[in-house]
């Protein structure tokens, strides 16, 4: 099965409506790079939550403002990866999402 992947790219995401229209008209699943794009019509994403990333980055900035030396601070990564599925978008693109995958999803948009 073919699919279209839209990464977290401002140029492409700004034209997401057009990409969704093409994917729907051609019945090609649209997999996206982040949850907001799933809400905008993508079928699914498995990735980070940018709000949580911003919070974590803000906490690190507070440490620096309170005197921590950035050169000695440990590198941090966001461990919380989320599976988000849009069942309406999947249906419009001719995709049947297996129930076991829906059961594993952190968020299902209906």
Task: List where the protein language model places each region.
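Short hydrophobic alpha-helices and adjacent helix-cap/hinge residues
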Residues: 1-110
């Amino acid at each position: 099965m073919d699919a279209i992947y839209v990464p977290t790219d401002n140029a492409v995401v700004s034209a997401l409506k057009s990409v969704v229209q093409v994917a729907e008209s051609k019945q090609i699943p649209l997999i996206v790079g982040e949850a907001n794009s799933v809400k905008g019509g993508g079928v699914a994403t498995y990735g980070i939550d940018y709000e949580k990333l911003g919070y974590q980055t803000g906490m690190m900035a507070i440490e620096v403002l309170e005197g921590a030396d950035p050169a000695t601070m440990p590198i941090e990564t966001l461990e919380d990866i989320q599976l988000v599925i849009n069942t309406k978008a999947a249906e419009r693109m001719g995709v049947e999402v297996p129930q076991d995958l829906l059961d594993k999803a952190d968020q299902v948009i209906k």
